[in-house]
Amino acid sequence: MKPFALAGLLQLTERRAEGLSRAVKLAHGVWLRARGRQVQLASLRDAHVTGLAGRLRGGVAAGQLREMNRLQRAQAAELHAAQTAIDAAHVAWQARLAEWLQVEQRLKALRLLQQRHLAQVAIQQKRIEQHQHDELVELAHRRDAGRWGR
């Protein structure tokens, strides 16, 4: 019987799908860590704002107020950078996911073709076995007919 003609391609596609699966998981982890960093920064900012509100009620010098404002701007810039990192990580994750899904569809199609090939091979094998059986029966019948005909 002929081997599955696309076996090599199927094997390569399986390896590619496995590699892409790992890449999707890695990209998702990067995205989750970026989100965690943003939550951490927002929590620090909120704690700073709460502390700042208490200090402002008691009054602060102009120099201290400038320093507090500078710190708030720095925190806002960090939060913006964190959001940018989240967005980039999300885009990368979605791109990997889309690529993996495409390869998975190709893999599914190749596996279906392989199943059809195996089914066809099984049918051919049954036909060969049936043909061989029929030949044996015919030979036995001729042999028996030759004995009785004498």
For each feature predicted by the language model, list its residue ranges.
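Charge-rich amphipathic alpha-helical interaction elements
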Residues: M1-R150
